[in-house]
Amino acid sequence: MNWTGLYTLLSGVNRHSTAIGRVWLSVIFIFRIMVLVVAAESVWGDEKSSFICNTLQPGCNSVCYDHFFPISHVRLWSLQLILVSTPALLVAMHVAHQQHIEKKMLRLEGHGDPLHLEEVKRHKVHISGTLWWTYVISVVFRLLFEAAFMYVFYLLYPGYAMVRLVKCDAYPCPNTVDCFVSRPTEKTIFTVFMLAASGICIILNVAEVVYLIFRACARRAQRRSNPPSRKGSGGFGHRLSPEYKQNEINKLLSEQDGSLKDILRRSPGTGAGLAEKSDRCSAC
């Protein structure tokens, strides 16, 4: 299985993740995918051909193997890693959409040169607003997928130790036959390692959800105690808000009113018509 494409996609998300999220990604790729690709696939590579039962009855080996190993450990872990990594793509799509809006605003303001557009693509997006919800939802889904696969693994293979010998009496076996599993010790070691890595990822996901909620509450408390000034506020999200647009309209009206009063001061003999218009504008 080629994991390069998945790694490329998730590396982009890593730039906008929290510190705990970056640790989670390291655990995913170093302790799980690398071990799965380099070692585990070779250990389980001959599991079907080396599963031998002490009978010559045609079909008995295949039926017994399917009974005790309904899905290969390697394929189950591969499916788990793909589904666990998929929610992170929600964050990547949200960040791409947000950067697209920022580029659009730059073009509307006359700053659509390649240098500014590249700067938008490179800068780190803060986890706030709707992106905060997207990020939290993705972490929760990661947590649910990890827990669901741990439960499925427990249902399929109770215990973590790989047995050396199994007894099978499924049809078409003529009687109860003994079947031998290849490399049971190696498979037990890798099973324990992968389950431990999955448990670490669950702990990291829980810690990241708690961290995100705590940081959002702290930010909200800080905003209530120190409301942000309008002068220092920037960013494209603020420029798109209705409050910003209304403030700009009021500013233009006040500037127009001030310039009209200036004209009246400089030429006092222009008549009462302009004064009336000025008063009318002020009343508006």
Curated annotation (Swiss-Prot):
Q: What is its main location?
A: membrane
GO cellular component terms, semicolon-separated: connexin complex; cytoplasm; plasma membrane
Fetch the InterPro entries from UniProt: Connexin, Connexin32, Connexin_CCC, Connexin_CS, Connexin_N, Connexin_N_sf
Q: Which residues lie on this side of the membrane: Extracellular?
A: 46-75, 154-191
A GO molecular function assigned to this protein is: identical protein binding
- Could you confirm whether the keyword Metal-binding appears in this record? no
Q: Which SMART domains match?
A: CNX, Connexin_CCC
Membrane topology per record: Multi-pass membrane protein
Where does this one sit in the cell? Cell membrane; Cell junction, Gap junction
* Membrane spanning stretches: 23-45, 76-95, 131-153, 192-214
Which keywords describe this protein according to UniProt?
A: Cell junction, Cell membrane, Gap junction, Membrane, Phosphoprotein, Transmembrane, Transmembrane helix
Q: Tell me which residues bear Phosphoserine.
A: S233, S259, S267, S278
Q: Which GO terms describe its biological process?
A: cell-cell signaling; purine ribonucleotide transport
Q: Which residues lie on this side of the membrane: Cytoplasmic?
A: 1-22, 96-130, 215-284
Q: Does the keyword Coiled coil apply?
A: no
Query: How does this chain assemble?
Result: A connexon is composed of a hexamer of connexins. Interacts with CNST.
What does the record give as the function of this protein?
One gap junction consists of a cluster of closely packed pairs of transmembrane channels, the connexons, through which materials of low MW diffuse from one cell to a neighboring cell.
Instruction: Give the protein family.
Output: Belongs to the connexin family. Beta-type (group I) subfamily.
Q: What is this protein called?
A: Gap junction beta-1 protein
Q: Which gene encodes it?
A: GJB1
